[in-house]
Amino acid sequence: MRNFYPARNVPLHVQLRPRASPGFTLIELLVVMVIIALLLALLMPALGSVRRAAKTTVCMSNLRQMAVSAGSYAVDFKGLSYMYSWTPGRTPSAFPDLVIPAGAPTGSAFAAQATDIIRRRSPSEPNFALPAPWLPPIDYSHLVLLEYMSVPLPVPISACPEDRNLQLWQGDIAAFNAGSFGTRQPAFTGLAMSAFRAKPYSSSYETPPATYDRSPVGTRLGQAGFDHYTYVVNNNTRFGPARLDEVTFPSLKVQLHDTHQRHARRQLFFTHPSASQPVLHFDSSVVERKTIDSGLGWAPNNPSIGPTIVSYTPFQYEPPTSTGALRELFPGRYRWTRGGLKGIDFGPEVTNAR
């Protein structure tokens, strides 16, 4: 018979404690943070470029949609460009205050037509007030095309995806009318106060005047010298639709363009020599164009002299000048194409057209 005795001084349970792993030192944490910051610094410009490229694609799509609709309009209206057609004594509106009598200025009939479109197409403003004075062929000719497209106003395709202010106004017209956006919207003061109320229905894309100015030399629309949005007209200036077969070089003549370069790190007025943007040509092509590659343009009432000089004097809601000055002076470029519809914007300028 065997006897078993527990061994003395031998622990019955042996506990193995894991060795504590060393922690990060402060220096190591700082190194990791620096590496992350460097990676973010490298990635952010690339991500910004990707976002800008995506928005450029949307912008070009907007212009193509406008081109398709303009082409359909021309087919339905015997080759004419879209343009206001009401005249004093012939303003077929259901709104009594928009019936303009014969003998009134032609511009008042255009203002009535534009107001009629807004009242019927905008759920937000069925009682939109008739602005006066207002000449909607300048900056608002697109409303005729949107009316043809039977879309509610305002419509997203009229705003460049980088035109944040216009998108802001479109999204909350009541706040715009209340002045809630501060310096991000126009001030309702001065002669143009009532016309500024139409800004939510404006477009990032402008139509060159040759498309709607049917006047002979000496009575044509001209650029005022003190800012980029003011024009000079007289009693003999005639507005009307152009025949598209008047366009001699459709692949080289701009039909629609943004007033600013928006798809870059810095926004610039479109005539700035460093500006670049997608433009719609009369052949319906949409091409990224550099301003420096375009002709200088002309003075439509003095075709033999140099180009129209445009004074970019930004409103409070617009991009500042590139120099920080109150204004910058530039040749008018493809806003004032030499030769008008017979001219060339990108290539040798036509010199014999009047």
Task: Annotate each language-model stretch with its function.
Residues 60, 65-354:
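Short, well-structured segments within or immediately adjacent to enzyme catalytic domains
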Residues 21-61:
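Amphipathic alpha-helical segments typified by the pilin-like N-terminal helix
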Residues 4, 13-15, 47-51, 60, ...:
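General helical secondary-structure elements
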